[in-house]
């Protein structure tokens, strides 16, 4: 395991160092695109199939990409880089290496952050496949119901870190509405709302 982790570190450092300065210019700034990834498929032999289990089984995959590429190259390029990351970091060996880093944090058991201190971290997560709004809570209802009882609102409480930039797609409710959540640095949420409104003009 330590050999594998060492190899990943050496590869990451080599890729960062492979961006030389040209004519005295600074090296390009990188962005860290972090997304939630489900581990159940890779770890299915560890999850009992003969009884219920209620537990998170997710981690993060991180795509390091030059900010210049993020701004200037087509969205399809960014998507291909993220797809490559999902394949590479979704392997059983990679997941075991990742969780070994989590266990090194005895207090929070928090996932590690990758990159350097100059990076901008952007977090995105799509929970639609979890079908949270299709969870039936009728068994917990005080009054007897004739049909299912679905949630009307879902809220995420991040921790142990307080991130200042992230978006969550919670999913689609029973009325067909899509719910988003997120956090931005203080004073920047107004700009976020304007951008969302601009993007929704054609819908």
Q: In which residue ranges do the predicted regions lie?
A:
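Acyl-CoA-dependent O-acyltransferases
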Residues: 1-203
């Amino acid at each position: 395991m330590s050999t594998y982790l060492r190899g990943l570190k050496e590869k990451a450092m080599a890729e960062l160092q492979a961006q030389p300065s040209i004519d005295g210019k600074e090296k390009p700034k990188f962005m860290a695109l972090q997304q939630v990834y489900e581990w159940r498929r890779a770890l299915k032999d560890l999850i009992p199939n003969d009884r219920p289990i209620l537990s998170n089984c997710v981690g993060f995959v991180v795509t390091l990409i030059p900010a210049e590429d993020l701004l200037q190259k087509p969205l399809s390029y960014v998507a291909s880089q993220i797809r490559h990351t999902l394949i590479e970091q979704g392997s059983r060996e990679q997941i075991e290496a990742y969780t070994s880093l989590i266990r090194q944090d005895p207090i929070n058991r928090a996932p590690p952050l990758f990159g350097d201190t100059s990076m901008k971290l952007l977090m995105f997560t799509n929970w639609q496949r979890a079908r949270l709004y299709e969870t039936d809570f009728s068994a917990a209802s005080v009054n007897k119901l004739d049909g299912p009882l679905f949630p009307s609102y879902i809220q995420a409480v991040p921790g142990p870190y307080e991130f200042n930039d992230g978006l969550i797609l919670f999913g689609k409710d029973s009325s067909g509405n899509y719910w988003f959540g997120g956090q931005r640095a203080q004073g920047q949420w107004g700009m976020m709302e304007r951008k969302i409104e601009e993007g929704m003009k054609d819908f």
